[in-house]
Structures are given as C-alpha cells and as structure tokens.
Amino acid sequence: MAKREKLLKPRQAIAKMDPYRPPSSGRGGKMRLDFNENTEGCSPRALQRLKGLGGDTLAVYPEYEEALPQLARHFRVAPNQLTLTNGTDEAIQLVVNTFVNPGDRVLIPRPTYAMYRFYAQVMGAEIVEVDYRKDLSFPLKELMSQINSRARAVFIANPNNPTGSSASPAQLRFLLRAAPRAAVLVDEAYFEFSGQTALPWMDTYPNLFVSRTFSKAYGLAGLRVGCLFSNETNIAAIRKGQSPYSVNVAAVAAALEAVKDRAFIRRYVGEVRRARAMLCTELTRLGWKYFPSDANFILVDFGPHARRMRDALGEREILVRDRSYELPGCVRITVGAEAQTRKLVSVLRSATKGVAR
C-alpha cells in the first residue's frame, strides 16, 4: 500500500483561528432585521443602471479612472485620498496588510465588528481587546493604557456595532494623538444615521484612516463596495498592496448612481431615524432596557428572556441577531422602515405578554 502523503499544514495563525460562520441562508422572504441592511432595497437609479449594463461592459476588467474623481467629489476629498474597496472588509484587510507585521500589537474594543479581529489574526498580530464599559460607552482610558511601542493599528467602529454607541470627536482626536505610530481606522459604516465623521481631519492626523460602505444606508450589501480614505501618502502605500480589480464593474456603476440619488438616502435615513425613536418609545413602554443608538439598530437587553423573545419574533418571520454570546441577554434589532417597525412593535407587545417578569 502506498504510503499516505502528509497533509499540508496551514500557518500557525490560521490553525489557531476559530472559523467565522455568519448566517448566510434562509433569510429570503422574511423581515431581515438581523444584519443592519437597508430593509427597502437600493436606489431605483442604481437598480436601473445595473439593468442597463451590457455584455460589452461585463466582458472587460473594471476601470476606476472616472469613478474615483466622482466619488471624491461626493465625499469632499481628493481622488488620491481614497481607494475603492470590496466592502469594508477589504478596507480592514488593506490596513492590516500594509501596516501590521506578525507580532505587532492591534487594539480592538470589545464587542465590535468581528472582521477587525479576523484580519489581525490572519496576520498573526498580538490582539489586545478592550471591553466597552458597563454602560457600553467608549473605553478611551482603557484603550490608552494598552498603547505601547508595538501598537501598529487601532480599529474603532463609530458608531459601534453591536452597541450603537459612539466615541466623541474629542475622544477620537485624543486617541489619534496618543498613538502616532499606529494606523487608526475609524469605521463609519453607519455614518449616514449618525452624521458624525472624522473625514475632515485627514490632513491633521497622518495616522488616520476612515472607511465607508455602500452596504447599509445605500442598500448595496450584495455588491460589496466601499471606500477607504486617508492622506495621499497612506493611500499610495495601500494601493501598492491592493488587487487592481477587487471591486467589480456592477458595484462601481451602482455606487456612482447611488451617490447621485441624494433624495433617496435622505428619505430612507429620515424614516429610519423616526422608526428608531418609535421603537425606543415602545421598548420603554414595555419595560425592556435598551442602549441608546446612533446607528440603524437598537441593542435590547431582554435578560433571561432573550432566546424566547428572539424565537417569538422568528416565528413571525422577523429575523433579529442574538448577541448573548458576548453581551448576555442582549439582542440586536435592525431598524427598518416605519411600517416594518410597526409590525415589529406589534409582535414585541404580544411576546412580552407571554413573558413572566
């Protein structure tokens, strides 16, 4: 019998990782309040542009020469201060690949978006996670205590996911000054709902990076497109290590139309903010604790009833995200349109009546 060949061994950093398996099926036809997506879809203008793409366009590699200046004008930056990315995930990966070596220290608040830890682990970095405070406010002092000469990256989601809380401009500026040798990424995936941005600071802080996505307010999550911003020198370095065609033609075309349809974004964001206020009012009336949010979701503390409340919503085909594995008793609920929120509230009322407290 032939001797069995030895299997290849992955790098130690990969071997030590736990696989990341987000829910990826069984969501069709349901009220999707679990992934913080736009619950109504993308701009009709973007959809029409996608329908108009011809075979000749799809047959060639994407070109970004015209897209970058148009997006730069929209975001009020220079074309050499941004690069297109395959969603926020690639933006995170590019910052790690460009500025972090194996063994370097990466600071990440906890809980937060899982991909910060994911890409730092792939690199083999030393990951230091700093817990948000009990009231889920930003742990500035705790982060500061972990900054040392080996700190090469700090990842801040602002507003944060899943807490919905934000670091103040003063706190972010303090952190940027305190970690001059680290790439500080401020992930503004939920900017449209909060209105707070660090983009104007790029000329002041050479270690600042900002990411934006078209997956949330713009309703283009399925196309995977975003932007990474920093000063000209940083972006030149980022582009050196970036795949030349990481963002596809359809994604670029849709993004360019999406930013032109400002009325669509204003209407949707305004509706979500009103629905968020409606949901908070109802949660208070029902006696459920929740955490104030600057994003398009609310983190609700159902305590020992978290699973029961999640399942009650699921039975009515309303999907929510149980975050009890990192915040005991907490469920994250995406805020959609007002009509969707009224249906959600109706189910919450019914489910609450069946819970003994």
Q: Each PLM stretch: what is its role?
A:
Residues 170, 311-319, 324-357:
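PLP-dependent enzyme catalytic core of the Aspartate aminotransferase-like
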Residues 78-82, 102-105, 150, 188, ...:
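Short acidic capping loops at alpha-helix termini that bridge into adjacent secondary structure
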Residues 134-192:
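Active-site phosphate-binding strand-loop segment of PLP-dependent enzymes
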Residues 207-291:
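PLP-dependent aminotransferase class I/II
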Residues 2-87, 94, 357:
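N-terminal small-domain helix-loop-helix segment of the aminotransferase-like
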Residues 272-273, 277, 282-316:
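Conserved PLP-binding catalytic core of the aspartate aminotransferase-like
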Residues 98-156:
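PLP-dependent aminotransferase-like
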